[in-house]
Amino acid sequence: MKLFVGEGNPQGVKVLAAAALWAQHVQIDRLQQEEKIVPFMSQPRLPVLDLENGNYLFLSNAICRYFYLSSGHDMCDLSNQWLEWEAAELQPALSAALYAHVVQGKKKEDVMATISASLKHLDQSLAGKSSPYLIKDALTVVDIVVWGSIYPLIVDASNLPEEMASLKRWFQNVSQLEQCQKAASSLLKDKGSSVFKPFLQKQPAPITPPGKSVCKEQEGEDMPSLSEEDIQAAAEAWAKGLTGASKPKQRPHPILPVEGEKNVLITSALPYVNNVPHLGNIIGSVLSADVFARYCRLRNWNTLYICGTDEYGTATETKAMEEGLTPQQICDKYNAIHTAIYQWFNISFDYFGRTTTQHQTTISQDIFHRLLEREFLLTDTVEQLRCEKCQRFLADRFVEGICPFCNYEEARGDQCDKCGKLINAVELKKPQCKICKQSPVIKSSKHLFLDLPKLEKRLEQWLEQSFSTGDWTSNARFITRSWIRDGLKPRCITRDLKWGTPVPLDGFRDKVFYVWFDAPIGYISITANYTDQWEKWWKSPQQVQLYNFMAKDNVPFHSVVFPSCLLGAEDNYTLVNHLVATEYLNYEDGKFSKSRGVGVFGDMAKDTGIPADIWRFYLLYVRPEGQDSAFSWSDLMLKNNSELLNNLGNFVNRAGMFVQKFFNGCVPEMELLSEDKRLLAQVAAELQQYNLLLEKVRIRDALRCILNISRHGNQYIQVNEPWKCIKGNQQEQKRAGTVTGVAVNMAALLSIMLHPYMPTISSVIQEQLLMPQESKVLTTDFCCCLQSGHQIGNVSPLFQKLENDQIESLRKRFGGGQVKTESKVSPSQEAPEQQAPKASGPERVKELMQELEKQGNHVRELKGKKAEKSVIDPEVQKLLALKKELALAEGKSPDPPTQKGKKKK
């Protein structure tokens, strides 16, 4: 195996590093770029990997991937998504930037601006991660490919923007690897980026891909510079007030599509009834869908949001056996629990139903008959596991064993929780009956299959159309294409169970439909339980836009199986236009697990004393949009105390208090200066970005726009000091009035923008400001909705500080990691100070060091922005507390005065 690398070719950095890491036995030859290696290519192409079987690889990412896989590593879906992003987004932008800098002589700071969105995407993806790498706790090919693309332009971490601390830290870590250092030095030869000039001069000038990149769509802070026209337009929109603005629409039920209007049908994945949803379930479907539904209503779009519990299947039967209840009793019990949890989280379903209804049976059987009549169903004999002791076939969750793909020891008979792959129960190694733990035998049973190969062509045609016109998340597209690429196979739609929708066909009447055939039909049947005019939503694809929200493991059933059923039924069903899938939310350093009780569950959240809106905010702030993210108690405290208390809450409270204290609760006259108009334009730009992002269902990123506006507001108040101006002459008092009036109108706008995310806080702000009803519609412009003379109500703080002791208590209470283990091992009533050292192992020290670094960066950022002393001091105290805790964890004195003095310098 030989690797040929061209001198001065930037793509050589990553392949040389990958070879050093994972392919030590490869022979490396360095050639001039003009030398031709691949005989069947008309033009020279380097780098090239000449494989021992006579084949060639000549894409740098493919070469890196080959080295990585050949060394025994595996690639997950997330790895492939990152490599796709790097090739489609990052590489083109970096190539153009490197060419502009090296060949055209443009300043590095100028070309850096052209890649800032991509770099910010990387920085945000790395921020808050406990791991120093992009996707795992260990280095992967993704880190090397991305680092190798960035390195030729950046060379040194000091060239990255100061505010991108997470990216700088990652870049430095990878750059310090011996293999990466050797790869870079052997190619750059101490010449820096200029070494690439001879190669780049022979290349055509790169063209930046047209249109906005994914990163720019995701990025809420990357605002374009403001022109005089922007500022003038913002001032004119402000002056119009609410004139011509649409009024909030009444929503009489049942809500039905209206011809000529934007009709939005929203579904969130039906939660399994048999268990209490955890925070990952909540953010993955119902909360994300709720934010979008509330946003649509704010825009006066005709919107219906439906959901319900998925109540059929083996999970319900096994749960009923565990609790000594009937399946129906289990469904009734847990449906009530789900309903209560979602009500507490303020999820605004228009209708929350269930699948154990007559409508579910009728509609499922109708679709089945239509598929049968059109010959889209097959009959086949299936080998299944049967427990002789229990006298039943062991479908899905009735059996557990070792995963045939990843060797996970507790894989279910339908899917592995660890690797996510779908499994046939007979494929399990060492299977056991879930009920009696006996080893089952293999027996045959006749079943019905959906003939997916026969439907594949029409499915592909529909998918291409939906991909091109709809907003599908990248993971949804990737997973769907993977299924199509691998070729569709007939899929079993029946099970040997009692609890489910009965199969209406002779020879199969003792069976029920497999849950993934009839569960998505639950969206339709739940709508039918809401209104007898359900077909206006579900058989009207021309005038309805359907949004499906779910976690990524549900994607194939919503993008392949369910649409195939509806296409095959040939009954003009509404198919999904926009499929919005999240990655996974982890818990601290582990994973949530319903069956193993790991993590915070919905019914526990309300017992913490933390309001529902704070939970909503934090879950949406860390929403796993591009990759997996993690719930962290420390980070929850940090975000509450910094973003909510010190940023958003501080601004809204000050704006209202100034009106109350200085102007007797009456909005003052406003005479705008140029700096005020510029602020209006900044706010308008953030509002436009917020709308753009939410229309694209970029929920997490749109939240940043809200926080940006409140930051602008805090800075505006701090610079203009209305509390001083009000004590001055008449002109200064007028200035105080203008600043206060603009600020309180910004607070009013924030209350509307906050509504999808924090509906209770939104209502509290609106009540405090006594906002008129007609102002509670989200417009596309920032206008003055609280005119001079408007009387506001009593203003009070919106948020409370979360204390470290409170958070540590909750961390211990909800387990996970060392604390959970300790509580089991040491139930004795030792004093807290005696127990503390047990939790201060190397893992805790590492965690504290990361928290300390993050808090230190935060304090420096606040000081750099010249924030108020009242804002900085609490953060400094938090920093000192972390230093003290770290010293204790390391067994040092917590209060070394000489070191403290040095730190203050």
Swiss-Prot record:
Residues 844-900 form the WHEP-TRS domain. A motif ('KMSKS' region) lies at residues 591-595. One of its GO terms (cellular component) is cytosol. ATP binds at residue 594. Belongs to the class-I aminoacyl-tRNA synthetase family. Catalyzes the specific attachment of an amino acid to its cognate tRNA in a 2 step reaction: the amino acid (AA) is first activated by ATP to form AA-AMP and then transferred to the acceptor end of the tRNA. Plays a role in the synthesis of ribosomal RNA in the nucleolus. This is Methionine--tRNA ligase, cytoplasmic. It comes from Xenopus laevis.
